[in-house]
Amino acid sequence: SNTSFDRLKNIIITHHDIDHIGNINYLREKSKNNIKVYAYKSEVSYITGEETPFKLYMLEQMVDKIDDKMLSMLNVMGLGFKSSYTKVDVSLDNHEKLNLGEEIEVIHTGGHTRGHICLYLKESKVLIAGDLLQVENGELKPVDVMYSNKQELKDAIKNISNYNIETIVFSHGGLYQRNIIGTLKNLIIE
């Protein structure tokens, strides 16, 4: 790979799920830079390990009701989170604007996790959606996870539909560039 971790200077975390924080310590170790990690204020304690991540907490509450396979998965997940906790350098607020080459607006959405954020790049008209939205069979839809707050998801979609978005980038599933505002408004009605 031609990728050099030495080009990396900043990481903005959309939420504290393990697939979003899992390799940050590795990246920090491999880079010659002092990489700054940014996260929404209510996510910081989960990312640093001060609080148990919500999904892990929910699984731990069901430990007496789960089979051996799920218990094994819970143990692996717990170990994964513990090895992934990392320092957060910058705690973010809703509508905070960052200038990291282009102005980036922090949009607190909640829904997927309590402190989930999207990032809006006004000049590029790009929304980095984190795990708020996904593309399934070519169609834009909310992420359907059992721990998501459905009303917060709907409110978040309504909120982001007010931005001038031409491209949505997802954590899982690439890009979406077709009739974004119309599609978002239809998701609000559903």
What residue ranges belong to the model's regions?
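Active-site HxH/HxHxD metal-binding segment of metal-dependent hydrolases
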Residues: 2-90
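Metallo-beta-lactamase
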Residues: 80-84, 103-181, 186
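Core catalytic region of metal-dependent phosphoesterases/phosphodiesterases
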Residues: 36-39, 184-190
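Hydrophobic/aromatic beta-strand patches that form the interior of the parallel beta-sheet core
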Residues: 12, 38, 90-92, 107, ...
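Cytochrome P450 C-terminal beta-domain/meander region
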Residues: 91-100
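Short, hinge-like loop/turn segments at secondary-structure boundaries
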Residues: 53-58, 147, 186-188
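A generic secondary-structure signal
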Residues: 1-2, 159
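Soluble, non-transmembrane catalytic domains of enzymes that act on hydrophobic metabolites at membranes
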Residues: 7-28, 96, 107, 144-150, ...
